[in-house]
C-alpha cells in the first residue's frame, strides 16, 4: 500500500458504512482522506497515519454511506399523465385510455413536440428531489422519442443534466421501448430504423453509455431484441434489458447471452433465467415502484437471486406511466416490505450493486481507497433506518467528488 502523507481534506467523526462486498462493513468512528476527487485513505480514525490535511471536516456523529445510485430512470420526457392516473381510478381501462390517444403514445407525442430547453427544465424539476436524498449517480434512458431526431434530443438533455448539476449521469438509448404510431403493424420495420439509424448515430455522437430494449408481448419479441443487441455490439455499446416484467419470455436469458450488464424488472424470471444471469454476471435491477403502481401480485424471485448469488440492484424507475416516483429512499422501504429484501440488501441495491448495473463498480458504489469521494452523511444511528423511515431524515450533507454539494 502506498503511504499517504498529504491530502486535500480529511473527514472524520462519524461511523462509516463502506458496503464493500455488498455488506455494511461498518467502520466505527472512521476517517476518510481525499485528494482531488478520490479517496486516498479510509479506516478507523484511531488508526489514521500521520497525514497533513489542507482542510479538516469534523462530523458530530451520524452515519456515512456511499453516494446513492439510481440505476434505472426515464426522467426526460414531455407532458404529464396524472389525468390518466385519475381516469384509471375512476374505472377507465388502460386500453380505453390508449384508444383515446393516451398511454405511452401521449408521452411520445408530447416529447416530440417539446424543445430541448423545455425537456431540460422539466427534467431538472424531477431530478432535484433525488439529489436532495443523496443520489450522486443516475441513469437516464431515452425511449419516448422513438425516432432519430427525438431520441437524440432526449439523450442530449440527459447529458446536459450532468453538466448543469453536481451528479454523474449515465445515459441509455432505449429506442426499442415501444412501437411508434407511424409504425403500427410494422414492428420489424421499426427495428430496422433502431438498428440501422438510431443506434449508429447515437454511438457516433457519443450520447449513450448503453443500449436497452423492452422485451414483452406489448413491446418487442426476443428475436427483435436480439437484433437490437447485435446492433449495439457493432456500435461498441453494452446492453441492458427490460425483461420478464409482465410475462415469461426468457428475455433475461437472452440478456445473459449477450452478457448484459443488467436485466430489469424480472417479476416473471424463471430459475433458468436466474442461472443464466449468474453465469453471465448480469445484475438484477428490481423496480418496486412499478410493481406497486401496477398492483402486481408476482414478486421477483428474490430467493433464487440469493441462491445463485445474482447481485440485486434497486432503482426508482421514475417515469410518467408506471412509476411516477422521485424517491430512491422510498424504494428501499418498498423493497423490504414488498419484496422481503433485508435493509442491508436494499442499501447494497442502491450503492455497490447499482454501480455494477451501470458498469461503474471500479470507481463508485463503495467507500474504499481509489474510488470517487462520493458519500452521504446521515443524522442516523443505524443503517437500517434508511429503509425503515418513510419520509423525513434527509442527508445532513452530500459529498460529490470530494466537495460538499450545495
Swiss-Prot record:
Required co-factors: Zn(2+); Fe(3+)
Q: Which InterPro entries match?
A: Amidohydro-rel, HutI, Metal-dep_hydrolase_composite, Metal_Hydrolase
The UniProt annotation places Fe(3+) binding at 72, 74, 242, 317
**Record's superkingdom?**
Bacteria
So which residues are the signal peptide here? none
The entry's keywords:
Cytoplasm, Histidine metabolism, Hydrolase, Iron, Metal-binding, Zinc
Which residues are recorded as binding Zn(2+)? 72, 74, 242, 317
Any one cellular component term from GO for this entry? cytoplasm
Chief location? cytoplasm
Q: Give the location in the cell.
A: Cytoplasm
Task: Read off the SUPFAM superfamilies from this record.
Answer: Composite domain of metallo-dependent hydrolases (SSF51338), Metallo-dependent hydrolases (SSF51556)
Binding residue positions for N-formimidoyl-L-glutamate: 144, 319, 321
The entry's function note states: Catalyzes the hydrolytic cleavage of the carbon-nitrogen bond in imidazolone-5-propanoate to yield N-formimidoyl-L-glutamate. It is the third step in the universal histidine degradation pathway.
* Name the UniProt record assigns to this protein: Imidazolonepropionase
Originating organism: Yersinia pseudotuberculosis serotype O:3 (strain YPIII)
